[in-house]
Amino acid sequence: MYNTLISVQQLKDLQTSGKAFMVFDCTGDLMKPEMADTLFATVRIQGAHQAHLDRNLSTHGSSAVNGGRHPLPSREEVATWLGSLGFENQMQAVVYDRNGANYCGRMWWMMKWLGHDAVAVLNGGLQAWEAS
């Protein structure tokens, strides 16, 4: 189980291990939120799910846990979204982005907030993956 960082090689090994895992692309751009969809459609780790800052990692309704520009969704909302993707508690989660671990850090924290320990940030993000 990886619970902080995972290297590119460790993720490649995980992909061929037969173990249950899920990868999340947390790429975002505060100035151009629509770019997250464009970048995700253009290049991503094969099989990755998009974790969009505005749609998945924050909420703007009455269920917000706190205030601010991107308030946290409730635990229930996050769990429902993850469940809709087929994510289960025994799975390893790997999160990455293209922004120097900016939004993937939020996803990592949110999964810990839900009580999920097996979540790790891809060391070096998508840039490291593409360079390998």
Annotate each PLM feature.
Residues 1-132:
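Cytosolic catalytic domains that perform sulfur/thiol-centered chemistry
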